Amino acid sequence: MSDKKRINQIAKETGLSNTELVATAQSLGFEVKSHSRSVTAEQAEKIIQGVKTGTDTIVKPAEKTVKAKTKTVPETAKSKQEDHPRTFAGKAVVEDPAILARIKEKEEAKKAAKTEAEPIEEVITTEKPKVAEPVKKSEPKAAAKAEETKVEKVEAKAKTVTPKAEVKTENVADKKEPVVTEEKKKSLTQKPRIQIKVIKRAEDIKKEQAAARPEKKKFDKNRNDRNNRNDNRRPNQNGNGQGHSQGGNHYDKNRPAGQGQNQGQKRDKFASSGSSSTSDTFTPAASGKNNRRDRDRKKTDSNRDNTKDGNRKGGPLRVNDNRNQVRNARNSNWNQKGGRGRYQNNQSSNVPATQRKFHELPESLEYEVGMNVQDIAKSIKREPAEIIKKLFMMGTMVNQNQSLDEDTIELILMDYGVTPLKKVEEDKSDIERLFVEDGYLNEDKMVERPAVVTIMGHVDHGKTTLLDRFRESRVTEGEAGGITQHIGAYQIKTNGKKITFLDTPGHEAFTSMRARGASVTDITILVVAADDGVMPQTIEAINHSKAAGVPIIVAINKIDKPGANPQRVTQELTEHGVFPVAWDPENGSEFVEISAKFNQNLEELLDTVLLVAEVQELKADPSVRAIGTVVEARLDQGKGAIATLLVQQGTLHIQDPIVVGNTYGRVRTMTNDLGRRIKEAGPSTPIELTGLSDVPQAGDHFAVFEDEKAARAAGEERAKRAQLIKRQNTRRVNLDNLFDTLKEGQTKSVNIIIKADVQGSAEALAASLQKIEVEGVKVDIVHSAVGAISESDISLAAASNAIIIGFNVRPTGLAREQAAQEEVDIRLHSIIYKVIEEVETAMRGMLDPEFKEEIIGEAIVRETFNVSKVGTIAGFMVIRGKVTRDASVRVIREGVVIHDGAIASLKHFKDDVKEVGNAQEGGLMVEDFNDVEIDDTFEVYKMVEIERKK
């Protein structure tokens, strides 16, 4: 058997189309239905040769049978058959040539009989229509017997014929008999042998239908044509000549007699009353299967007609299409004016439903960073979509609620021709601006205020004693060690005028407190002891006052002492830029010699203060919200955070919402310097208040806000910023400080937790401890706060291995018990220099001890003894010093140290001894060393601890 090939494979090899190959194969009689079928090599050659040479199609056996019966076929019929091939289900349908010849003859007879058929048509139209009588089944069969016998053979082989073939067969049967004769005019009522079909002219039918149709109603012409065509395809027996357009009964074997009449009545609305042209035809009996096939075929034809007419460009418009157009017009015409209703949108209108007024663009726009598209659109009265489109064209995709940056806002405003002006946002949390802002105070409401005087000077020069004389109280007696620990604010009245005094510590640890005191003061009283003269803190006070631009009044104190020398003090002050008024009238300072202990010249000093204050013309506005500075702050167990404030501008009232430093609250209580509760405090008034959420820092500013909500927001924002700054100041390891950091890993540190009574003392103590310089040890302040020592402080100290230092505070009972359990060291002090001295001593003791090598003896090896399982024993003689058991030894050979180790054993003769003296012999073993030779030298030494120099 030869190899087979598929048609598509042959097409690829030869370059021919699959369709040509399949058609040629079928014409050659091969059983090939598609290009996927296989053929032999011989068949393939025949197919290819047939395609190339154009071989005629071989007739199939069914066609041969028909052609055998055909003797002569006219050329016209043959050409007609070739021009219009009839197909059914994609297959060729073979027709009898005799039938085609008869069809041609009948068509010629039809043309000749048209003139004779017109009088008959008029007679029929004048007669009264008669009801069609049921036609018996045998009559049409007898009438068309001859034609059936001819068509039977074709039907037997083709089995199924298209509706067009049926129509042609019926027409042949109709046209076989004479169409018009005089005898048939007389015998119209008689039963004819063949039914005559009288057809009206199509032009007349169209005119009558157009005249009977209403003007506003438009029907589909193609649908009427389809109905007529379908009626012609369903011939019926009607005795009165009425067709389907007027309700003619369609003959069906499986349908009741009255059903066709009802269907004709339903179709009556598509035809006019004058259209009475009908056709009484017959059809051969068909089975139920054929009827179903006919109905399916009619539906297919109807759908095909719809597709050809309505869905093709240029086809007639249907009623449904009209309705869709109206609906689309209603949806698209959204801006036409009209009321609600089904037909309102059909009314045309040129006025839009919503007309947006034209708004002119502003010349400039003050914008804020973070505005969105919707905000900008409202400001310039434009649609957000328009702005979004502009931004999209600029390469920025945003929505109307998205925040825009500064550059984008300016870009879109400039695109519209609007000048962008950035709105300067007022930082409400920045309370420092209120102290320098010009518009905050009302010039017309300014009144004279008391002067704020700060007393400064070196430690133990009499500052607190002087202030005590002013207040006529015994403040100094309450100070531990006679040293002022923290700042105090007091107000006195002399000659009808008030003066506010601030007392600052004189110890070197309180530098920051003196600087804060100078920043809020109007006048500085520099106290200098006449017997001591100018000291380091005196110079520091001078520098602080000059930096703040504050006038200085020099009070030379202790002039009552025997060694007092005011002239020497004046000379020393001039060396630091402080000159008496007699020496420098313009920039000179007032010098007053006083004795605070004996109340000497104090009134003169107060008069000098009032004189200098009057020259300065100190004023304030009591009508605004209060602002000022924190003098001191502390934590009380019962009252909470307590802050000493100095009001500088405005008036402070009870229940005022206030922001103090990085904390906030509401003024709960206010007390003056005498401990009395007050309801308001004016400018230059020192007060002590409660109600804050946390303890502020000394030197922080405070300001009163309009409501508590704003105060809370400002306080939280300031706390957040302070935390951020603290994090930024935290030292980070980088390549620059990596080596230093690694070196610090060898440095020991002492962890300290500081708890003090006031914030200023805690700050000063922390600064002083961090200044302690001991090589190899540093101070690490783990925590610093105000208030009593609590359980949380003990837990923190235990976790960080820290020492707790309490300054003027005591631990609670529970904290003391917990400290005993955790073995936490608590040191309580009330004098700052004692704290510093104690911590410095502890830091020096934390250092590792220093050792120095001390040579105690020297010996020479005289003999060596090797003992199994023991090692080498060296016999030696001490030539200098001594050899001890607890010492170390170096083995030196020819001036080179070959081993350095400990002595494992030491003997004098056979006895174990602790030492061998000078000029004595003995034996020893060097630990982990057996390579000892004669004449080696033993250098015996010890590491002696030496005391660290302070």
Curated annotation (Swiss-Prot):
Keywords: Cytoplasm, GTP-binding, Initiation factor, Nucleotide-binding, Protein biosynthesis. Residues 503-506 are annotated as: G3. Residues 457-464 are annotated as: G1. It is found in: Cytoplasm. InterPro entries: EF-G-like_DII (IPR053905), IF2_II (IPR044145), IF2_N (IPR006847), P-loop_NTPase (IPR027417), Small_GTP-bd (IPR005225), T_Tr_GTP-bd_dom (IPR000795), TF_IF2_bacterial-like (IPR000178), TIF_IF2 (IPR015760). It holds the Pfam family GTP_EFTU. Residues 322-336, 343-352 have a biased composition (Polar residues). Residues 77-86, 128-158, 165-186, 200-234, 291-312 have a biased composition (Basic and acidic residues). GO terms for cellular component: cytosol. GTP binds at residues 457-464, 503-507, 557-560. CDD domains: IF2_eIF5B, IF2_mtIF2_II, mtIF2_IVc. Residues 595-597 are annotated as: G5. One of its GO terms (molecular function) is GTP binding. Residues 69-92, 128-352 are annotated as: Disordered. Transmembrane segments: none annotated. Signal peptide: none annotated. Residues 448-619 form the tr-type G domain. One of the essential components for the initiation of protein synthesis. Protects formylmethionyl-tRNA from spontaneous hydrolysis and promotes its binding to the 30S ribosomal subunits. Also involved in the hydrolysis of GTP during the formation of the 70S ribosomal complex. Belongs to the TRAFAC class translation factor GTPase superfamily. Classic translation factor GTPase family. IF-2 subfamily. HAMAP family: IF_2_B. PANTHER family: TR-TYPE G DOMAIN-CONTAINING PROTEIN, TRANSLATION INITIATION FACTOR IF-2-RELATED. This is Translation initiation factor IF-2.
